[in-house]
């Protein structure tokens, strides 16, 4: 049974024994929620801040006892109409019913598929692709959304059309028929679909062992204490949003959330909720992608006529999901340090869906670590620290240290051999938080999830992992430096020009810093074959390139969204500044700089720049014509 200490005492985690996570047989989140329903039944479990009708929001609360009852009712209904192994898709708006839907699927012993209301803008194609891939027998939604969901699936044949259940219409009395599911540690709990931008999304199989393991890893990294509470606006269909909101089910205290749109429209809502300290609660924790820190710093600072703000109780905000910018963190600290925000509060982190979510983060007593390395050495797969003002200096943000009972090694993927600290290779992972494969994709699963590390170095980062352990290939470049993990970039996004490697985020950063005419965080760098460049490039004397139908050499393209108020500016000086900065900083010629309007660059469902989708739209001409349909991150209220 899970135990917490007295109020104010350190969070005691009985599942960590001798540095490894150990669970009793058949431990799962269902058992945790049922325990809290018994020992904290009259206490707040979840609060949804609903800003759809009131500017200041309406708090919609559910207690642990009621949460358990609703979960059992939905779980029982699913047990009545589905079979073990069936997929249950969640097409709910982000509210309490979404959480009840997800837990209801876990309570039923079926496989949850956290998705989103089809009314959300920008996601229709992805939603159809995921439903085709997982073939759910049932869809959970709400009474208000049910009609839209039925219209959305109407085009499917009757045989392929899932049953639609409105969870808020399921009587609580049905809970009396619920039976504890016969799920074990290896049973798949849910499918976490990746945020791929060009290929069909893959559903990572997360088991009933993977899920609590990763939740415990996050809580341990955050040094949770009795009374700590969570705050989030992240979408539940994204791995970071889902795992963050599930922390409450193990910690046993309350969690407050809002919709992504509520944050995007008024980021001060998130900041003020982080500062709120009701009753005897302890510290506050949260998570957000990098852009949120910049957005909050610009638009979330309280006005003079608003109540005072005290952020001294904010313990940790995981910063992940996209590359972490030192400038964004600096702006966030400068904006909120006057309100008591600790320098240790923001935690640059690393994670991915294949690991359930969490891999590493900055230790709680440390400020974010930013070092500078030589660009040429970096492009040659080596980490060599230099002074910040050195000519070739590139800032690198530490992703901290790997979580408890988890292993991350840097590998030469060609030889499956571990590399020493300071050398860049592919990050391979092992641990009980790693998913078991991709749903219905045996070959792809084997390539990603079933790799053997053929050789280890002395003082190996794999120490403690079995010799025959299976390792997950992340597709990310990284290295260890001074005992911290650093992420260099995605292998598939690497730009190779004239035989030299260039990390796209490095090129994007240089372009961003060369001009104020680009939206912060909305720049994409990629390469295309010379003979596939559009004719307009060859007509431009600045490109310095003549068309040759046999020239397949890779050429650099930069696409950037114009910042607000810059649409009337002459584009040529902006383009010239970008070209010059990259030529000087990287020694490479930019053959095309395309400036587009806000909202044009494709983004993945987790908000990252979709470089491959952007490249595809560039090649087919839709990006230049402005008729592309990028994925939109924010969801509606």
UniProtKB/Swiss-Prot annotation:
Presence of keyword Cytoplasm: no
InterPro entries hit by this protein: AMP-bd_C_sf, AMP-dep_synth/lig_dom, ANL_N_sf, FAAL/FAAC, FAAL_FadD32
Protein name (database record): Long-chain-fatty-acid--AMP ligase FadD32
EC number(s) stated in the UniProt entry for this protein: 6.2.1.20
Enzymatic reactions: a long-chain fatty acid + holo-[ACP] + ATP = a long-chain fatty acyl-[ACP] + AMP + diphosphate
Organism (species): Mycobacterium bovis (strain ATCC BAA-935 / AF2122/97)
Described purpose of this protein according to its UniProt entry: Involved in the biosynthesis of mycolic acids. Catalyzes the activation of long-chain fatty acids as acyl-adenylates (acyl-AMP), which are then transferred to the phosphopantetheine arm of the polyketide synthase Pks13 for further chain extension.
Residues the record lists as binding ATP: 194-199, 349, 353, 476, 490
Gene Ontology CC annotations of this record: plasma membrane
rRNA-binding among keywords: no
Annotated metabolic or biological route of this protein: Lipid metabolism; mycolic acid biosynthesis
One GO biological process term: fatty acid biosynthetic process
